[in-house]
Amino acid sequence: MAHACLQQVGLKSRSLQIAGSLSHGDKRRLEIAIVLASSAEVILLDEPMAGMSVENVPELVEIIRSLARTHHKTVLIVEHHMDVVLGLADRIAVLNFGELLICDTPEKVIANPTVQNAYLGEVL
């Protein structure tokens, strides 16, 4: 099972490496492989794109998308990069100092004037 999970995230060829010797992006993939091996139905990913090089983000987005769809997992992502969130989420909750501003579809969130003013100026 471990090798199958590593293969799904593109790490099968590195299965004998020590985790500490992996690149930051590969460590993120390893974290997701560990999640795949678990029986958890709900997965929390805290800033999964943090420290990732720009060229590796799309691949990690696809791995996370696969985790949700192929493996029927609910994935809760804490992420500050709205462009990444918009590409992944079915629903988005926007918090401001612990207050829930909105929880809705990506389309409705980006159309919300409060969210546009506070968070999306550079994305839109």
Regions found by a protein language model. Give the residues of each.
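Glycine-rich phosphate-binding loops of nucleotide-dependent enzymes
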Residues: 1-124
